[in-house]
Amino acid sequence: MAQQMPSPEEIAAQLQMIRDQIAELQGVLAQLELRLRSVQAAKETVEKAAGQDGETLFPGDPELNTILKARLLEPGKAIVHLGLNVYAKLDTAKATEILAKKEDALKRSLETLKQELDKLSRTHDQYLQLLQALTAGQAAQQAGQQQKQGS
């Protein structure tokens, strides 16, 4: 039994679903990239604080709109978010290690999602080509029928 070719309307609907998935995935990627930059900035701050004693300057935000002059109350210590709203005061080496693991996990997640986005983009392109071929074929068929009727 021959498989019936999907209609242009069905392919267009599939294309829209793929576009929606691509847009959603791009949003998730943007959020993960923001989280990655945040973790990287936190790691850099902890690394900088590790060797400081007394007053030092710290960035107030990633874009350096503000720089804060601060005195470390406990040099060599950092309070790090462990997840689920749990924080721990750790030595800076352990804090840096935890942040590095978070950074690696985010990078792996980003890579996986980018691969998925590439796959979806290729699928989108294939569906688009199929839709264009079908609509071109239908247009040619209609033109042929009109010529027959005109003769």
UniProtKB/Swiss-Prot annotation:
Keywords, in A-Z order: Chaperone, Cytoplasm
Keyword Cytoplasm (UniProt): yes
Gene Ontology terms describing biological process: protein folding
Lyase listed as a keyword: no
GO MF annotations, alphabetized: unfolded protein binding
Lineage of the species this protein comes from: Archaea, Thermoproteota, Thermoprotei, Desulfurococcales, Desulfurococcaceae
Organism whose genome encodes this protein: Aeropyrum pernix (strain ATCC 700893 / DSM 11879 / JCM 9820 / NBRC 100138 / K1)
Name by which UniProt lists this protein: Prefoldin subunit alpha
InterPro entries reported in the protein's UniProt record: PFD_alpha_archaea (IPR011599), Prefoldin (IPR009053), Prefoldin_subunit_alpha (IPR004127)
Cellular component GO terms held in the UniProt record: cytoplasm; prefoldin complex
